């Protein structure tokens, strides 16, 4: 730790003293948490109070984790490959289609255990707007389960039962956007300037037109363009996916802190893996496709360090539907290797795994992407997504 950072850390550790394990992890990963955030926000006067609030939330989360979660934190600290072992078997489903409710999922855990499942990914289950809602990815409340599925208490009980059966629980957290009906967006519509600053909005078409010169359309048929005029705001809102999904503004350190706390709260329910939805889109830049920007990886590095300090049992899975040569970066590369996400979707490989048996042909699987170069004959990767989706 650099001397100037050591002095800063000492003040933080003194303020948050009380949990020896937390303080030890904080010292170990403090630089990994601090440095990317300083690079992103260091010149922003809002940063220091938001960073202090984040540290407080991390300390509170670590303190509030029950004995079983603390034990799991310790176990996974000493076995960091727990998610990558060859014995792992994953099962992905929609809770309502599989068992009706979260309680129904609990009742079917013996069946999943019989199958050898060690990892259960329940597709989006947080409260979403009424349809259309992008298959549940237009979230109105990160702190509430979709009412038809149950409650947050049901989610906690399910997570505990899964642990008892030796299974991990994965849930989706939508980082790029919220539904228009989310409390933050509603506050913005009501005139709250602070909450308006949570979103990417523009008073005219000057900047949107500049961005759209190089932006691909995700849903050109049903939601053309990447900006939506909102009369109540008299502003253009960035809407990468649908008009009802408002993109968050991660140049605002308060947004980072708020979404980090969403992740901490989900970790407190006992969730083991957070599937980070649409992560390539988190940072926008004129003259690019506003995907896979370097700042996206700095955000992920800070979130990974946060989890290692406050909730070390929790892993990250990146939903980055990008070309294979761009995908590896979401696991961390160079000096950041292993410091972003633990898993990432390989969309090309997934498609090949399905197309090979259906076409009764395996030749195209032999070289899905040559090392160090683009895939031969590969069409532009689809940047959109369809519901249901992985």
Where are these regions (language model features)?
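Acidic/aromatic-lined carbohydrate-recognition and catalytic surfaces
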Residues: 1-251, 256-257, 264, 268, ...
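Phosphate/diphosphate-binding loops
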Residues: 315-318, 360-377
């Amino acid at each position: 730790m650099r001397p100037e950072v050591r002095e800063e850390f000492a003040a933080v550790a003194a303020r948050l003293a009380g949990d020896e394990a937390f303080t030890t992890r904080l010292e170990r990963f403090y630089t990994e948490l601090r440095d990317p955030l300083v690079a992103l926000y260091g010149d922003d006067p809002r940063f220091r109070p938001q960073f202090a609030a984040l540290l407080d939330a991390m300390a509170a989360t670590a303190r509030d984790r029950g004995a079983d979660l603390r034990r799991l934190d310790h176990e996974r600290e000493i076995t960091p490959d727990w998610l990558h072992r060859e014995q792992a078997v994953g099962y992905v489903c929609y809770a309502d289609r599989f068992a009706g409710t979260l309680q129904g999922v609990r009742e079917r855990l013996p069946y999943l255990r019989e199958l050898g499942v060690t990892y259960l990914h329940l597709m989006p289950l947080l409260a979403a707007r009424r349809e259309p809602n992008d298959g549940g990815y237009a979230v109105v409340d990160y702190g509430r389960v979709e009412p038809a599925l149950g409650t947050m208490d049901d989610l906690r009980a399910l997570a505990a039962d899964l642990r008892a059966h030796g299974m991990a629980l994965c849930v989706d957290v939508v980082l790029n956007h919220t539904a228009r009906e989310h409390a933050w967006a509603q506050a913005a519509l009501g005139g709250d300037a602070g909450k308006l600053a949570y979103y990417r909005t523009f008073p005219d078409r000057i900047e949107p037109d500049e961005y759209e010169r190089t932006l691909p359309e995700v849903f050109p048929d049903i939601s053309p363009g990447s900006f939506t005029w909102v009369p109540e705001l008299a502003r253009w809102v960035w809407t990468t996916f649908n008009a009802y999904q408002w993109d968050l503004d991660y140049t605002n350190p308060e947004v980072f802190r708020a979404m980090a706390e969403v992740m901490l709260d989900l970790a407190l329910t006992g969730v083991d893996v957070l599937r980070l939805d649409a992560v390539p889109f988190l940072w926008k830049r004129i003259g690019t496709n506003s995907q896979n920007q370097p700042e996206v990886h700095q955000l992920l590095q800070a979130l990974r360090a946060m989890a290692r300090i406050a909730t070390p049992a929790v892993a990250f899975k990146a939903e980055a539907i990008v070309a294979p040569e761009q995908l590896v970066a979401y696991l961390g590369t160079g000096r950041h290797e292993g410091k972003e996400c633990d898993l990432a979707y390989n969309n090309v490989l997934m498609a090949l795994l399905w197309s090979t048996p259906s076409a009764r042909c395996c030749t195209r699987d032999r070289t899905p992407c040559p090392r160090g170069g683009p895939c031969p004959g590969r069409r532009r990767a689809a940047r959109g997504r369809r519901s249901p989706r992985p």
